[in-house]
Structures are given as structure tokens and as C-alpha cells.
């Protein structure tokens, strides 16, 4: 029981950290220099809301088991949508050229997982769901819940990989822009993505799924919260400082220069635009 209380206290720390970051980002929206930055801020706010919901669920998982069974659809839904919105942020920041809307098909699989968990919540008796989560018994319900959670984990790993590939592609496309190499590198974003998967998602998954290795290491759950808090702080500070460079879409005049072959003047104007965006931020 004492271990459950300790685990709940530790799991509450990322929720509090996310709430503080959420407030800071919300207060900063009016200062955002352009529409793209505001869009990034709104996406970050969504991520922090989902993080709060998810870690609140883990607190319930530790000390309020009956409440967690009822809360399970919210916990699963938030966990499945977090990597999608993090990828959306990467998608917006790394946009080069004509800006396209974030494809809605990325939300289909998380939505399907959410529907699946809600169907279980409304059709399967409470005690049967309780046994599937806490008794580690073999049943159709436990198999569906475990499979859904595994898909959420794979989804997180997949979109982390897609984010890293997009950052790599972005770096390759902006090598000719010399306005601010440090801000264009997005090393902080790559670090958050890798750090989150290796030191947060996988250990938490091991605990929830009851993998023996993680259950033997009784205090490992203490360290899973440290990467969560650290990545939240790094993400918040870099967004607040606008530690990235938004490459503006090519204008009609620039397209005309490209057609006429005036590449030198075009390149100079593009660099000046990026420099101006940097100074204005």
C-alpha cells in the first residue's frame, strides 16, 4: 500500500509539471509573432492537456483502482493522441515551401482505438474489466485491452520515427539558409523525441503490461517520471523562446524570379526573410 501511495505521488509530478507548462504557454499566445507560431502554441496546449489526462490516469491506477476502471477510456485516448499532436508540431515547424494542412488521416487509428476502449467500457461488466486490468487473468477483455495498449506504444514509436525523419529532411532542405544554423538544427526536438520513447514510453508500458523485468525493478517507475518532467520543461522553454525558424512560403514574386532564372536575388531575399523572422522573434 505504501508503495502504491509513493507511486501515485511520483506519477502526479508530471501532471503538475504539464499544468504549469500549460499555463505558461497559454499566457504566451498573445505574444506569438505570427499565425504559424500561434498554431504551434495551440498544438502544444493540446499536448499538455493530454499529458495531464494521461498521468492523472496513472495516479488513479496506483491508488484509486475503481476510479481508474471508469477513467480507462480517457487514459487510453490521451495516450494514443499524444504522439500524433507531437508529430503535428514537428510537421508545422519543419514546413518548407507551400504550407499544407496537417493530414487528418493521422487521427484515424487513435480514433479507432478510442472507440474500441469506449465500446469495452460500455459493454463489458465492471468486475470483468477490473479483473482484466489488475488480476492479469487471461480473457478476451484483457487480450483486447493489452492489444490496444501495445498498438498505442507502437504508434508512439512509429510517430517518433516519422518526426525524426521529417527533421532530417528539413535539415537537408534548409542547408542553404545561413540565417541561424543553431535554431534550424532542431536538436532539442530530436532529443525530446528520442528521450521520451527510450526513458518514458517503454518503461511505463512494461509496468502497465506487467512485464516481469519491470515488476522486479520496484523503483523503476520513479525514474520514468524524470524524463517526462524534463522533456516537458525543455519543450516549454524552447517553444516560449521560439527556438526554431519558420521558413515562409514562396511568394508569387519569388516564383517569378525562379522562372526568370534570378536565383541569386531570390536566395538573398529568402535569407533576409528568415533573418527578419528570427530578429522579430
Locate the predicted segments by residue.
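Hydrophobic transmembrane alpha-helical segments in integral membrane proteins
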Residues: 1-20, 149-153
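Hydrophobic alpha-helical transmembrane segments of multi-pass membrane proteins
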Residues: 14-25, 42-62, 82, 112-120, ...
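Membrane-interface helix-boundary motifs at transmembrane edges
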Residues: 30-41, 92-103, 172-185, 217
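Helix-loop junctions on the outward
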Residues: 53-74, 209-214
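The cytoplasmic-loop to transmembrane-helix boundary for the fourth helix
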Residues: 95-120, 145, 181-196
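Membrane-helix interface motif
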Residues: 119-132
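Interfacial "cap-and-anchor" motif at the non-cytosolic start of specific transmembrane alpha-helices
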Residues: 181, 193-251
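Conserved small/polar residues in nucleotide/adenosyl-binding loops
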Residues: 277-281
Amino acid at each position: 500500500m505504501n508503495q502504491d501511495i509513493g507511486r501515485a505521488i511520483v506519477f502526479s509530478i508530471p501532471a503538475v509539471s504539464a499544468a504549469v507548462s500549460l499555463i505558461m504557454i497559454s499566457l504566451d499566445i498573445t505574444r506569438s509573432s505570427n499565425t504559424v507560431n500561434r498554431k504551434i502554441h495551440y498544438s502544444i496546449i493540446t499536448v499538455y492537456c493530454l499529458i495531464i489526462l494521461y498521468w492523472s490516469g496513472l495516479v488513479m491506477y496506483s491508488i484509486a483502482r475503481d476510479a481508474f476502471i471508469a477513467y480507462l477510456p480517457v487514459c487510453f485516448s490521451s495516450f494514443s493522441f499524444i504522439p500524433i499532436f507531437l508529430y503535428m508540431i514537428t510537421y508545422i515547424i519543419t514546413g518548407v515551401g507551400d504550407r499544407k494542412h496537417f493530414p487528418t488521416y493521422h487521427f484515424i487509428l487513435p480514433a479507432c482505438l478510442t472507440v474500441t476502449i469506449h465500446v469495452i467500457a460500455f459493454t463489458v461488466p465492471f468486475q470483468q474489466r477490473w479483473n482484466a486490468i489488475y488480476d492479469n487473468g487471461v480473457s478476451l477483455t484483457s487480450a483486447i485491452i493489452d492489444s490496444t495498449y501495445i498498438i498505442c506504444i507502437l504508434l508512439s514509436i512509429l510517430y517518433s520515427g516519422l518526426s525524426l525523419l521529417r527533421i532530417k529532411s528539413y535539415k537537408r532542405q534548409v542547408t542553404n539558409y545561413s540565417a541561424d544554423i543553431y535554431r534550424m538544427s532542431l536538436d532539442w526536438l530530436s532529443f525530446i523525441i528520442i528521450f521520451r520513447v527510450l526513458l518514458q514510453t517503454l518503461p511505463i508500458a512494461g509496468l502497465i503490461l506487467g512485464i516481469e523485468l519491470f515488476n522486479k525493478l520496484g523503483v523503476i517507475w520513479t525514474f520514468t517520471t524524470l524524463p517526462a518532467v524534463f522533456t516537458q520543461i525543455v519543450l516549454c522553454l524552447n517553444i516560449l523562446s521560439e527556438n526554431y525558424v519558420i521558413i515562409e512560403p514562396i511568394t508569387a514574386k519569388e516564383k517569378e524570379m525562379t522562372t526568370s532564372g534570378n536565383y541569386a536575388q531570390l536566395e538573398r531575399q529568402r535569407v533576409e526573410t528568415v533573418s527578419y523572422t528570427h530578429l522579430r522573434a
